[in-house]
Amino acid sequence: MELFIIGMITGTIIGIPRDTYSEMLSQNCVKNGIGQSVIIGIGMSLAVAFMTIIDMIVLFFLGKYMLKARSFFTYIMSALLIVTNVIGIIKSDNSYDTDNTGTSFVNFMTGIMVGISEFTNIFLILFMYVYFDIAGLEFSGYAVLLGGTVAGVFIICVIIGILFKIFDNFRKIKSTRGYNLAVNIMMICVGIFIILKEAV
């Protein structure tokens, strides 16, 4: 848990100048002005930090539920997750069509792929809805938003559920110490991932 907090703080500190600079270089800086762009950039970093906290809490409990369910849906979604995650990483954030040059369907699919690769959830979606509204973006931005919402549902139902299913093997040998060790290792890995994710 300590690494989650460290990752959140570190990511926010790194993310504020990064997101602010990115926002100031974007076309929205012309519409919003430098002052408002700086505020939006800081808000984006804080939203990501807040999202991380909520993610860990929600995914922990839903992951335990998925572990008990043991449904075939988990395996189907995991396969879909791998495919969309790879595509999302390849396409990266630059695929966001904020100037209406593409179709709504392309934007929708981009939102799904990038959203899954970035652990999008409903809390970030709510913030980004306000962000897109402030930035004056048109329907393409909301199409990305809709795709990101779908991705958020997928990520909640799948990723942590699969992790807990893997770590359930430690419980089968009835070793509480081994199970706790596995959970701690998972938390450390996720904490490191948070730091790296926000630093890149």
Predicted regions and their residues:
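Small-residue-enriched transmembrane helix starts and helix-helix packing motifs
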Residues: 1-16, 38, 42, 91, ...
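Juxtamembrane transmembrane-helix termini in multi-pass membrane transport proteins
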Residues: 2-65, 127-143
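C-terminal ends of transmembrane helices
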Residues: 22-32, 89-95, 162-169
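Membrane helix-loop-helix hairpins that form the core translocation module of multi-pass transporters
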Residues: 34-101, 106
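Membrane-embedded alpha-helical segments of transport systems
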Residues: 43-54, 118, 150-157
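Small-residue-rich segments of transmembrane alpha-helices in multi-pass membrane proteins
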Residues: 45-48, 102-119, 180-190
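Hydrophobic alpha-helical transmembrane segments in multi-pass integral membrane proteins
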Residues: 54-56, 114-126, 187-200
